[in-house]
Amino acid sequence: MHGEDIHVGWFSSRQIDARTLAVALRQLLAAEKLEQIALKELGMDTAVGAALTQARLRFEDALPDIKHVRDGITHFEDWSRGQGRGPQRVARDAGTLPREVARDHWSFGYDPVTDTVTMGPYTFSVAAALPAASELCDAIYTAARAVDARNTAQIRQQAIRALTDAGVSCEPPTGPVIVSPGGDLRIWLSVVLAVVPEGERIGLAEKVAAAITGAGLCLESTTFPQAQDIARRMAEGETLQVRRQ
């Protein structure tokens, strides 16, 4: 929209971009709602959802009219006749004729001089939309990452508990098995070849694989995900990813 305006026939690239932007901005609110639903279903800490809510409120404060602008675009078959919901319904209920409602809530356009998008009486600033959208996107990502971080911590705890119950130490520096801390949101497991005699490696690897599998987890080779010889790969020093089955 801030670049060159390209005209193809009667169509302006800036006006097309304005429509796309309005719909995309409204979809961010839908994405936030979906994330909130997921956070509740997963039983996440309420602080995660609260932080996301605050980001959404700031987005709505920056773009209070975005819902109506988007509705006018996507429900044009109703808005063009004054039969839309929301503010158009309020106007009809107040006694305004549908054709007058349509007139007052129509005429979409982007004004490059003021850098604003308008739909009838509703408008939003493109300059304000960009940072607001960026912040809400970051907040949605942060909330999703919190879910991943919790899942990673749970997998790590399961793996360590399973190994401990099987009598396999994973405590550095003497433990024969290392379980990664999960900083990359993945859990990795490997045998410390330096502390395990060569003749004992395959037996230890099989014991580890059985313990992990028995805990409802699995070991996966990122080099060859379809590999069935997991114990052999572990015994040879390959680092494997721990996942839920």
Feature names for model-found ranges:
Residues D184-L193:
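Short, aliphatic-rich beta-strand segments
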Residues H2-Q15, A50-V179, I187-W188, I202, ...:
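Acidic, Ser/Thr/Gly/Pro-rich intrinsically disordered interaction regions
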Residues E32-G43, I73, E77-S80, L219:
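Amphipathic alpha-helical interaction segments
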Residues D45-T46, L52, D184, P197, ...:
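Intrinsically disordered, low-complexity coil/linker segments enriched for acidic/polar
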Residues A210-R244:
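A short amphipathic beta-strand at an alpha->beta junction
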Residues D5-A50:
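Short, contiguous, well-structured surface segments enriched in hydrophobic/aromatic residues
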Residues L193-G199:
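A short, exposed loop/beta-hairpin motif centered on an aromatic-Gly-Thr core
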